[in-house]
Design a protein with these regions (language model features):
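Short, Lys/Arg-enriched N-terminal segments with co-localized hydrophobic residues
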Residues: 1-14
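"Short basic amphipathic alpha-helical interaction patches in structured regions
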Residues: 67-70, 79, 94-101
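Short, intrinsically disordered terminal segments enriched in charged and Pro/Gly residues
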Residues: 11-46, 94-110
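Substrate-binding/catalytic groove segments of enzymes
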Residues: 62, 89-94
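Histidine-centered nuclease catalytic patch
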Residues: 58-77
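Short cysteine-rich loop/turn motifs with clustered Cys
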Residues: 37-62
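Short beta-strand-alpha-helix junction that forms the catalytic/metal-binding core
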Residues: 72-89
């Protein structure tokens, strides 16, 4: 059972969780028209990042982190993390979605 991604249902609200690998290579500038990768995530989802999306962390989200879904392919995604969680390069952990693809040919993972 290599898939560690799961979907929790709290009341009427579905919250997808993803087991991700935090990438070191995320230091590239945000795409044109966005002030940061966090701004990119917020504009693509239409939501405010709020708190860190790492499960169990409740600090303010300050970074748009580059991650890959563990056992999920080579696609890169952006997810809001606090700076402390984002600098744990190479770590695997659960995050709450949605995940926004870095390459726009892929769909947002809700």
């Amino acid at each position: 059972t290599g898939c560690k991604n799961r979907k929790l249902i709290w009341g009427d609200y579905d919250m997808a969780q993803y087991y991700v690998h935090n990438l070191r290579q995320g230091g590239s500038p945000a795409p044109a028209g966005y002030s940061s990768w966090l701004d990119y995530w917020e504009k693509k989802t239409g939501s405010s990042a709020g708190t860190c999306h790492r499960v169990g962390c409740y600090k303010t989200a300050t970074d748009g982190a580059h991650v890959q879904i563990v056992n999920g392919g080579n696609e890169w995604y952006i997810v809001p993390l606090c700076h402390s969680c984002n600098t744990q390069f190479g770590s695997n952990f659960y995050v709450n979605g949605p995940l926004v693809p870095v390459n726009p040919i892929y769909s947002i993972k809700w």
